[in-house]
């Protein structure tokens, strides 16, 4: 039997050095943003080619997910309706600002992914606002609509991948900010 535990032996040989958070390569945020924007734009093009405005919803996963084409000149729940171009300019500034920050000052992996999602969503919807004067939405959730109808009598908005990126990234960022920060425990050398 060893006089010390394995951890004690290792810590006597190798000092515990705090490590920086693991990071992606500096180009990763730009690639992730481009991939998410491409996916968003592809689905919007598909929806414009295959779905009809005011047509009945097409169930994908019955009761959970439907295809339903609509357009929005504002933000969620039609807030700021008729303001597509000013909203698009604001979104593109936010998206490019976040992406520039990530490229200029690399962050840990979690924050890089979350902020890249938000940037991609902002830029994806700004492309629609600048090109068409409206944002193309096509994803509807009957399940989420049932919840919002029970709470306040309104249907959950129809959304797109860009919206999912912004909302998902924001929720993840909020949850992470509420969790206690994990700190590495430093071993105290024994005398």
Swiss-Prot record:
Keyword hit for Glycoprotein: no
Top-rank taxon: Bacteria
Gene: lspA
Disulfide bonds: none
Protein name stated in the entry: Lipoprotein signal peptidase
UniProt-listed Enzyme Commission number(s): 3.4.23.36
Origin species: Deinococcus radiodurans (strain ATCC 13939 / DSM 20539 / JCM 16871 / CCUG 27074 / LMG 4051 / NBRC 15346 / NCIMB 9279 / VKM B-1422 / R1)
BP GO annotations: proteolysis
Pathway membership: Protein modification; lipoprotein biosynthesis (signal peptide cleavage)
Spans traversing the lipid bilayer: 26-46, 84-104, 110-130, 156-176
